[in-house]
Amino acid sequence: MSDPLHVELGRRYRFAASHRLHSAQLSEMENARIYGKCNNPYGHGHNYTVEVRFSGAIDPDTGMITSLADLDSFVNERVIEAFDHRSLQDEVPAFREAVPTTENLCIEIFQRLRSFPRATLEAVRIEETSNNSFEYAGKHEGMLP
């Protein structure tokens, strides 16, 4: 019998959240210089698009690597419910210390999704704006800075 075929699955999800880019390690002037308008004391919002990529063997009975319903449920529970319409630095424990940059958001979402039991998480890509996107593929394990 031959090895099962492996396929990558990409799926997109959306949520809205606000954040303020501000580092306690920097002075007010440094924060303003580095983060610009993203350092607004009142924060600002984004409509994020998150693409997750999983890989796995095609199940011979279903012809799929995983059930999309199972994947959607997992992502909704671990990501959408946790981040949608939230102030990241005020309501998400991971960002009480770490600056809620989209780079750090990629890592946090990757960590929340890597335990999906039916496929292997390959990468998380986040579109913050039409000009800015970030991707994390889990190559460098560790916690948020």
Which functions belong to the PLM regions below?
Residues 1-145:
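Charge-rich, low-complexity N-terminal segments
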